[in-house]
């Protein structure tokens, strides 16, 4: 016996739905709220969570399987359907073991519009697997919310087509905002388990970029589904099946099955290291280099010294002028951080930093928090890798910085100063104003998305002019 339920999320680019199927044994499904509460303890008190693992060994770990983010890579969704059928009806010891130890979250097809249209992109023409740090598309926002809610221990993203089948982890350069030593410790062994299951069941071979290649398949960019999930503590893998026919479905199915068995049997030790990721951030502990015993398994330089990050004490985000050109964009940035499970605080009183006085209500992102890596990825300007020679990237890193992209000012606080703050769950919505009295014209600066939207609304029914030179009015 086992239980499952299906939920749908609608409002996608082309009007179709996403379907999430959740499977486990009946006892687990009756206590879903309890298990989700346990996941929250990992973030609120990681040390208490570690103690709970010592006391109870009946906890379940969530595993997220993501089918066909690229619509024309059909095998991923087909393999997801086959996995659902097995997990729902099969009574073999392996299946029952997996259901007893895990909660399976299966997003059947991440890009239903692309699947119907036969396209890699969604109905808006976006490659959804380049969107996770911007989240411009509804499909991305939906899946990002699920990942942030569940903090899955493992995420498997099903793609095609590479020969032989490709199973991550990746080549360098590794993004320094991960806790890569903890990630690779389990991701590599899990990949080897997938490779072994694939070979045993199908005779197909696989490549593991971390072991088999010097470069060219890196996890530096945070835009991909597994890389985004890594900021939430997941052991994330992209799987690229080799064949477009039924053999490709077989390969995905058995590789995933190998991962499910591995995670089920090693969940206690794996969850400890997932919690350790959060504990390091929570206590502002230093990162660690990839251990020598792992480096010795590959012939290729992992640029280990570049896997470490110097985190600031905090980021200051002014809420209004003069420190912030656009309060709307500041609020947008703050809400984006909160939506992605990054903790944001508000100053309870004014404070001075580097000669500037910031008023009460200024936003502060303290970096001693469980998901500091994601916070820093969003807020940091990044590293200049121009001088790095002899290394090829899968997609040459573009500059990503949400503050720079959206025109929101933020200030780095290298060392902590004492500021009384309170955690918030939403930015204060900016309120505009309009001068009263007789006027021939109104003027405003187009310095936010809201301002451009207002300009477009005006153009629908009236005249709008753009100043060709600087001017002053009433001072």
Language-model regions, residue ranges each:
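Short, glycine/acidic-rich beta->alpha junctions
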Residues: 79, 135-141, 219-222, 329, ...
């Amino acid at each position: 016996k086992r239980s499952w339920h299906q939920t749908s999320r609608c409002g996608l680019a082309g009007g179709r739905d996403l379907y999430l199927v959740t499977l486990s044994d009946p006892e687990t499904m009756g206590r879903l709220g309890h298990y989700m509460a346990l996941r929250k303890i990992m973030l609120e008190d990681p040390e208490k969570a570690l103690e709970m693992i010592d006391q109870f060994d009946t906890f379940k770990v969530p595993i997220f399987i993501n089918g066909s983010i690229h619509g024309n890579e059909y095998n991923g969704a087909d393999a997801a359907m086959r996995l659902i059928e097995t997990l729902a009806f099969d009574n073999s010891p392996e299946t029952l073991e997996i259901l007893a130890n895990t909660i399976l979250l299966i997003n059947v097809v991440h890009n239903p519009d692309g699947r119907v249209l036969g396209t890699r992109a969604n109905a808006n023409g976006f490659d959804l697997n380049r969107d996770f740090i911007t989240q411009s598309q509804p499909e991305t926002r939906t899946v990002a919310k699920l990942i942030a809610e569940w903090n899955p221990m493992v995420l498997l993203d099903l793609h095609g087509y590479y020969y032989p089948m490709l199973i991550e982890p990746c080549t360098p350069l590794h993004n320094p905002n991960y806790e890569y030593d903890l990630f690779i410790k389990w991701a590599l062994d899990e990949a080897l388990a997938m490779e072994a299951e694939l070979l045993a069941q199908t005779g197909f071979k696989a490549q593991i970029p971390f072991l088999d290649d010097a470069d060219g398949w890196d996890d530096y960019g945070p835009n991909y589904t597994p890389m985004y999930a890594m900021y939430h503590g997941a052991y994330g893998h992209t799987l690229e099946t080799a064949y477009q026919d039924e053999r490709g479905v077989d390969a995905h199915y058995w590789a995933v099955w190998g991962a499910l068995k591995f995670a089920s049997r090693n969940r206690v030790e794996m969850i400890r290291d997932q919690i350790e990721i959060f504990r390091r951030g929570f206590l502002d502990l230093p990162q660690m280099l990839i251990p020598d015993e792992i480096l010795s398994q590959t012939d290729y330089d992992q640029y280990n010294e570049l896997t470490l990050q110097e985190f600031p004490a905090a980021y200051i985000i002014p809420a209004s002028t003069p420190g912030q050109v656009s309060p709307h964009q500041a609020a947008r940035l703050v809400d984006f951080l909160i939506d992605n499970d990054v903790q944001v605080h508000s100053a309870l009183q004014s404070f001075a930093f580097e000669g500037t006085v910031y008023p009460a209500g200024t936003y502060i992102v303290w970096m001693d928090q469980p998901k500091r890596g994601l916070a820093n990825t969003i807020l940091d300007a990044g590293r200049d890798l121009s001088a790095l020679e002899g290394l090829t990237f899968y997609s040459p890193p573009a500059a990503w910085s949400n503050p720079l992209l959206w025109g929101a000012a933020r200030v780095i606080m290298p060392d902590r100063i004492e500021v009384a703050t309170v955690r918030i769950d939403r930015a204060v919505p900016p309120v505009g104003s309009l001068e009263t009295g007789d006027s021939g014209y109104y003027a405003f600066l187009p310095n936010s998305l809201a301002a451009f939207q207002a300009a477009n609304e005006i153009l629908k029914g009236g005249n709008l002019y753009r100043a060709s030179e600087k001017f002053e009015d009433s001072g």
